[in-house]
Amino acid sequence: MRTNKEYKNAALAALKGNWAPALLASVIFIGIVWAVILPYYTVELAAYGLIKMEPLLMLLLLCFSWLGMLLLVRPIGVGFSNAFLQFMERGESDLAQKTFKGAFKGYWRNVWGIFLAGFFVFLWSLLLLIPGIIKGYSYALVPYLLKEHPELSANQCINLSCKMMEGRKFDLFWLQLSFIGWVILASLTLGIGLLWLVPYAEASFAAFYQDVKREY
């Protein structure tokens, strides 16, 4: 396994000269996420009495956000992650196109796989928070495996992810934690910095998956 610095350097080397398509994919993905979660935050404001809203409208907005996350954001997230994997492996820079192609090819399998992984994390979290977090890292490779192994069921992808992540969960946690400084800087730009941070992080995570796959 490479070091965090090596993953980040690999990501930056791949992105050099390819920031335009990476930013386009990032804008589209982040835009979709915000469009889906904004109604939820609007309901939050209403719940705290900061704005007035009818209970029925609050319920409808919550349903919209929940269904939007399940049926739109999650599968597009699968496509987004795999677009960057193909970018890191083969230099395919049509990231926006690859994102949607990956999301909607095998759409219901993507939806079911991510839902099932999230449901298992939820069940583990009912016991204690820490087991839920650990299981979340165990299932971290599911988005990649759903696309790379179409012959496997969603549950098989989850089990394979658990096996591949044995002894590597802290490595991924440490890699994610190494971006905390960039997250803080991005927040200071009212989120604009996320447009650059997201592709940088996704490319780094794809490089991590490449190593896990190679060593498994």
Give a label for each model feature.
Residues M1-Y216:
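Hydrophobic alpha-helical membrane segments
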